[in-house]
Amino acid sequence: MNKKNIHILMIDDHPSMIEGYKSILSFNDLGLQITTTPAYNCESAYNIISTTPVAEAFDFAFVDLSLPPYLEKNIKSGEDLALLIKNKFTKCKIVILTSHAEAFILDNIQRNIAPNGLLVKSDFTADEFLLAFEKIYNNHIYTSKTVVENIAELHEKNSFLD
């Protein structure tokens, strides 16, 4: 049986995280052959995004939020990269992976980027990461537990203040 090939751009300033994501995804139950392109900072990610033809669009982009910036191109974080990816590769599924658990940051990400997935790194195990990937692959939105709880709490506080 031929496996479907998908191409994933993985952006994280910790190479071990990228290796971990790749290892976990190799156990997917979807019959997918996964090809990855790594980037370790905003500059390398920008260069990959800008030189990849639209016809060779990435199927997924896993983007860490906190990355060394590329100030020459006004790319300050993973948020800027995610917006760049979203604008160029309109069918690419964006998954934001972050250590930030602050409700206002998470809410801002959802409002500004509207990613297909938003996961707080301390929330997920290998199994949950794989589940998130499979759900997103099947056109569902996935948010990890901390995202759901903290944004709900923020919205409760905001509605109380209104």
Q: What does each model-found stretch correspond to?
A:
Residues 107-111, 115-117, 123-162:
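Short, flexible helix-to-coil linker/hinge segments that flank and couple to helix-turn-helix
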Residues 100-103:
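Short, conserved "switch-loop" micro-motifs in signal-transduction and mechanochemical regulators
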Residues 5-25:
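Conserved acidic segment of CheY-like receiver
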Residues 66-72:
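The short loop immediately C-terminal to the conserved phospho-acceptor aspartate in CheY-like receiver
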Residues 57-60, 87-93:
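His-Asp phosphorelay/catalytic-motif detector in bacterial-type signaling
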Residues 72-91, 108-111:
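Short amphipathic alpha-helix used as the core "switch/output" element in two-component signaling
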Residues 38-60, 70:
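Acidic, metal-coordinating helix/loop segments flanking the phosphotransfer/catalytic sites
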